[in-house]
Amino acid sequence: MAAASSVLRCCLLVAALMTLSAMGAEAITRQYLFDVQTTSVTRLCSTKSIVTVNGQYPGPTLFAREGDHVEVTVVNHSPYNMSIHWHGIRQLLSGWADGPSYITQCPIQPGGSYVYRFTITGQRGTLWWHAHISWLRATVHGPMVILPPAGVGYPFPAPHEEVPIMFGEWWNNDTEAVISQALQTGGGPNISDAYTLNGLPGPLYNCSAQDTFKLKVKPGKTYMLRLINAALNDELFFSIANHTLTVVDVDALYVKPFTVDTLIIAPGQTSNVLLTAKPTYPGASYYMLARPYTTTQGTFDNTTVAGVLEYDDPCPTTAAGKIVPIFSPTLPQINDTNAVSNFTAKLRSLASAGYPAAVPQQVDHRFFFTVGLGTHPCAVNGTCQGPNGSRFAASINNVSFVLPATALLQSHFAGKSKGVYASNFPYYPLNPFNYTGTPPNNTNVMNGTKVLVLPYGANVELVMQDTSILGAESHPLHLHGFNFFVVGQGFGNFDPINDPAKFNLYDPVERNTVGVPAGGWVAIRFHADNPGVWFMHCHLEVHMSWGLKMAWLVLDGSRPDQKLPPPPLDLPKC
């Protein structure tokens, strides 16, 4: 059943791509209906009710071309508040459609609906959509395939076939109950029971062999795998036995191609990779494996998800009943930070005439953010399960973000920020310390709903520094509303005197989600040309739940095409 469903998905993808190819060069409006509903799903011999879109897990793939206008009507038939984020879509002048609850919109209440309207401007590649409230994105997510305009090819040889590969994370228990319990006790949440590949855990888990994704390939053909990490809390190593992968795109942005045996992909990130099948039938199958990368000192899901790469047999009748061998790749160690660093160092923008790297050469505003864990004190006479009887927290510049009761963007647009948010997010740590050395004795963080205000058109440089508080850890930071250039990164404390001289301002990789290295720092630059309120947060869901998030408020520009339009009439109310 599961193998058949994987074949059906590939057929649907091919059919959709053929339909898009047959359409003219002019941009069109593409309309989708998302029915958010509860669905019974069985994995690991355990059946539970999950929230899905259109009864599918993972959800449906959205197809569009660069320049198209997209309208997605979301009808909420689930018992939970809901909102959908179109991860990586720039949302130029359409911030009302970005999706994070209480940032750009109030959530869609049960029984309600909302139409997300946006235009895909200057983007092509693999992105994805997901719920952006609580932990509902565990099952409410799906791919977005954005093709170049009709008649425009890829800057690499066209593949024989394109296949979305979506990594996820599965709990036998209700994920809303998992995070609710963690927030009540102040401790860490229960870890997941499995990872998934296109919704299937694969044969390495008990009672799961029937739920295995299988990719059928023809000898000598090249396939483009559209990789998406939709896992909640884990970065993943990925490899296919006895095959190499050529990376051609990350976060829907072309890169200079390079070939690897293993890649790293963090939650929120996407990557297009080319897989060239062996020239002749090998008489074997090959595992596609993914397992976590982590430097955390706490518990985590140390399991491996497997799919199977199978070759079409040119002589299936003579091979009937014959069991072919299956090979497994060797993945890096769980905590192999060097493997991660070596991979990320290879990423460079294509920086060609057709796809230039518009790196801001001059900077108007510089910021320095610490990102990491911390604590809140336990309530008087309370019992908490965090470090030393405290409650786990997380922060940026020691501010643990608290979601407001109404949406920031609505409050800003109406000029009613009082009592909703403050515009004094710190530009740098108020109490500097040796960030990657011995942590301070006081690990408490402050709560706040603070934004950082930017003038329209500002060129921004931001250095994000990991801290050793409660252990050095990699943090995948996602910025809504913008792509950014990763101009530098390193280990230890950022050196503001010497490190900027090493920045790559020629062809740095451009992304929307970047890993702040464990025990290190990363520097990014972006051009603030999109008015609105834009969320920035760790894409490890547990860290975001603990407060590792903030918001940028980009003011309107002077021209009409630099001003955020009024909200749509059907925007949900709190």
UniProtKB/Swiss-Prot annotation:
Its EC number is 1.10.3.2. The gene is LAC12. CDD domains: CuRO_1_LCC_plant, CuRO_2_LCC_plant, CuRO_3_LCC_plant. It comes from Oryza sativa subsp. japonica. NCBIfam families: laccase (TIGR03389). Cu cation 2 binds at residues 87, 130, 539. Glycans are attached at residues 81, 173, 190, 206, 242, 302, 335, 342, 381, 388, 398, 434, 441, 447. Belongs to the multicopper oxidase family. Cu cation 4 binds at residues 475, 538, 543. This is Laccase-12. GO terms for biological process: lignin catabolic process. PROSITE patterns: MULTICOPPER_OXIDASE1 (PS00079), MULTICOPPER_OXIDASE2 (PS00080). Cu cation 3 binds at residues 132, 480, 537. It is found in: Secreted, Extracellular space, Apoplast. Cu cation 1 binds at residues 85, 478.
